[in-house]
Amino acid sequence: MAARDGDGWIQCRCGSKHWGKFGAAGILIFRENAEGGREIFLQHRAPWVHNGDTWGIPGGARDSHESVIDGAIREAVEETGIDPQELLIRTSSTDNHGNWSYDTVIAEATQELVAHELNDESHEVRWVLFDDVTRL
């Protein structure tokens, strides 16, 4: 396994401080549930992490040797224990700040995808109907 060299803060040209010396990546996972509704997989972040006590997608700092997809999947596996074989990568989107970027990988999951809070970075993980996301 290659060294983890991406953890750390960077002062961004936008004036903000961001986590991830080589940028960061997250994965937005969606699926159609058994009733035909669209769901998104969300993580309730622990209070001590960057942007803590908020709901969002699993993700974090990318290491220097990682592709966007590899970094996003690694973070999701570390935080939620998902099986990457249960994902179909659809696309990705980049929020580029010049000297730092955040990449969102968008993936479709099978109904069998199982996840749980795997480390102390999460209070909770769960599937949420698209229409219910703003209520969290």
List the predicted regions and their residue ranges.
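Acidic, metal-coordinating catalytic segment for phosphate/diphosphate chemistry
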Residues: M1-A34
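A generic fold-level signal
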Residues: W19-F22, E35, H50, H97-W100, ...
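A residue-level structural signature of the nucleotidyltransferase/glycosyltransferase Rossmann-like core
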Residues: W19-G20, T54, V125
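Short, flexible active-site-adjacent loop segments at beta-strand->alpha-helix junctions, enriched
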Residues: A24, N33, A46-P47, A61, ...
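Conserved hydrophobic "DFG−1" position in protein kinase catalytic cores
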Residues: I29-R31, L42, A107, W127
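Conserved Nudix-box catalytic region and its N-terminal flanking loop in Nudix hydrolases
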Residues: E35-E79
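Unchanged
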Residues: G60-L136
